[in-house]
Amino acid sequence: MSIRAIIVDTAGTTTDLNFIQDVLFPYSRKAMAEFLEQNQHNVVVDYCISDVKDIALEPDATLERVTEILQQWIDEDRKLTPLKTLQGLIWKQGYNRVEFTGHIYPDFIDSIERIKEKGIRIYSFSSGSVEAQKLLFSHTEAGDLTGSFNGHFDTRTGNKLDKQAYCNICNTISLKPKQILFVSDVAEELKAAEAAGMTTCQMIRFADQRQAKCKKISSFSELVFD
């Protein structure tokens, strides 16, 4: 069965992990307190603040305490929707101020046209919010790449380590699992996608990565489609 859609992970696959860990995460951590103070009455931000209190089981937490919780979650790299939503909003601020540009590996950029010419749809699936993904792909040194994507998925679709998340994606894009190729650097994510029936491929950007039991590539240029 031929591949009709490719789903790409971001951090470690299309994007350098160091950009996420050394640029985006510290920026959101540093900006969190001021951002919450200035935007606490925004509907989305207010909802996230309430969600943080619920998850932390601290219904009476002050704004200062909520900030501390969020900063702790950043340090722990927690994949929680309110955190990821707030980070996306904060990063939008940074992108708009041109304080950084999104890092995308050149081999992915160079492969986009080839993939699209085959009639294959491109989606991204990340623990970062859909908003954050759009920001990443729209503020690159190669320009705005979002027009090449057919959609984006985040934690609202499910946990990336959970088979059900990939089943949900199949249902959303109306394709059979084997018609979808999932590319990620994380072995546990690939295992979950494989359990859902997807075709999988591991991106090896570094020699010390934990190896998955599937096809491996070190560049998107190595992908071959029928």
From Swiss-Prot:
Pathway: Amino-acid biosynthesis; L-methionine biosynthesis via salvage pathway; L-methionine from S-methyl-5-thio-alpha-D-ribose 1-phosphate: step 3/6; Amino-acid biosynthesis; L-methionine biosynthesis via salvage pathway; L-methionine from S-methyl-5-thio-alpha-D-ribose 1-phosphate: step 4/6. Binds 1 Mg(2+) ion per subunit. Bifunctional enzyme that catalyzes the enolization of 2,3-diketo-5-methylthiopentyl-1-phosphate (DK-MTP-1-P) into the intermediate 2-hydroxy-3-keto-5-methylthiopentenyl-1-phosphate (HK-MTPenyl-1-P), which is then dephosphorylated to form the acireductone 1,2-dihydroxy-3-keto-5-methylthiopentene (DHK-MTPene). It comes from Shewanella frigidimarina (strain NCIMB 400). GO terms for molecular function: 2,3-diketo-5-methylthiopentyl-1-phosphate enolase activity; 2-hydroxy-3-keto-5-methylthiopentenyl-1-phosphate phosphatase activity; acireductone synthase activity; magnesium ion binding. Monomer. Its cofactor is Mg(2+). Keywords: Amino-acid biosynthesis, Hydrolase, Magnesium, Metal-binding, Methionine biosynthesis. GO terms for biological process: L-methionine salvage from methylthioadenosine. This is Enolase-phosphatase E1. It is an enzyme of class 3 (hydrolase). It catalyses: 5-methylsulfanyl-2,3-dioxopentyl phosphate + H2O = 1,2-dihydroxy-5-(methylsulfanyl)pent-1-en-3-one + phosphate. InterPro entries: Enolase-ppase_E1, HAD-like_sf, HAD-SF_hydro_IA, HAD_sf. SUPFAM superfamilies: HAD-like. Its EC number is 3.1.3.77.
